[in-house]
Amino acid sequence: MIITALIAIAVGFLIGYLARKIIAESKIKSAENLARTILESAKRDAENKKRELLLEAKEEIHRMRTDLEKEIRDRRGELQRLEKRLLQKEETLDKRAETLEQKENLLEEKQKEIQQLEEQISLLHQKEIEELERISGLSREEAKAILLESVQKDIQHEMAVMIKEMENKAKEEAEMKAREIISNAIQRCAADHAAETTVSVVTLPNDEMKGRIIGREGRNIRTIETLTGIDLIIDDTPEAVVISGFDPIRREVARIALEKLIEDGRIHPARIEEMVEKAKKEVDNMIIKAGEEAAFEVGIHGLHPELIKLLGRLKFRTSYGQNVLKHSIEVAHLAGLMAYELGADALVAKRAGLLHDIGKAVDHEVEGPHVMIGAELAKRYHESDAVIHAIMAHHNDVEPQTVEAVLVQAADAISAARPGARREALEAYIKRLDKLEQIANSFEGVEKSYAIQAGREIRIMVKPEIVNDDDIVILARNISKKIEEEVEYPGQIKVTVIRETVAVDYAK
């Protein structure tokens, strides 16, 4: 049994081995067949691809050959065209050269003819000169001198006539242009101002107030007149009192103080002093505001505060009845407009025009003409040299060296000379009153002085610590003599010297 089993196992092994061998050989043959099939297919594909590539290469070569042949044909055609154009140009140049040669030959012939004619003309000219010398008995040089002299006289006469015509034309054109510039400036500067007066009227609530203003034995009215330096005129005019004085600042102080007293109702010397001080401060503020408004109206910035204050004081100054501040504003506008027309520095012209009369704001207190005072003030407060020069030149105290200085001078003359701008009589009257005060203030010991009663009286306040009661009589006499020597006036002037000693104490 065991042997049989072993034989069976061996036979099974052998059969399995043979079966696997047969299967393996079959797979190998199948693989070989598949490999041969794949190889043959690859060879066929490669052969097909080769044929395709060869075909494409042949087509590309054919296309490139066709393009190259076309390009060669095009280049050949272009060369043929260029050759044709060159041939045409050569033919044209040949023709031009031939024409030029013909013209040169013709020109040479003409030059020869001209040379022959010139020689003939020269001979004829020489013969004419010889004949003229023989007939006139003058040599060539003598005849030339006579001819030149005659021609020179004619030319000089023509030149003189021409120069005269040009001068007249230039003057006419300059005058027309100047009139045009000035008329344009005047039309564009629409300024209006009324003539200043020397009186102010204060309205009263009733006529009983007149008695309160006068006060017991006139002490209130005397205090007002003494503190303000004006005349207070109380007459039959209903419900009104008149403040008269040539200094507008004093008159304004008196007006404001009186209106405040009337409004307050308490009128006595102590209250009057208080209100006058308040009025002075209010007028100072008005002066600063007027200066600032003037600078703003003209368009000027950067003025020193002291110049602003002095400008404001010009509001209370008059020149021949014309308000000096309004006059200065008008001059600034006119000078600026004319500067714009001429292409000059309009800002310098306007600034100098506004400040040209600044010296009039202080010429009561400082000696010298207002032009020099104004220039000194402008220099002190750091104005430019151009502005200072224009101020100095506006009355020809110095020769104007700049266009702006000339324009300020012209604008000043235009503003002052237009009809209705100024009144001589009023200015002469004010100057006479001003002169009276200057004479009184020139004496030692005088504290202040006021010309009142339309210049028929001058009241002088003296310092009691310097002038005693005996000295005031001599002082009044000396002032009277000086007035007689230096001032022309009708009638007589009353000189009143007041010495007042005030002692103040308090009861505790």
Swiss-Prot record:
Q: Which GO terms describe its cellular component?
A: plasma membrane
Top-level EC class as recorded in UniProt: hydrolase
What region holds the KH domain?
198-261
Name the EC number(s): 3.1.-.-
Q: Where is the HD domain?
A: 324-417
| Pfam families from the UniProt entry | HD, KH_1, RNase_Y_N
Q: Which InterPro entries match?
A: HD/PDEase_dom, HD_domain, HDIG_dom, KH_dom, KH_dom_type_1, KH_dom_type_1_sf, Ribonuclease_Y, RNase_Y_N
Q: What is this protein called?
A: Ribonuclease Y
Gene name as annotated:
rny
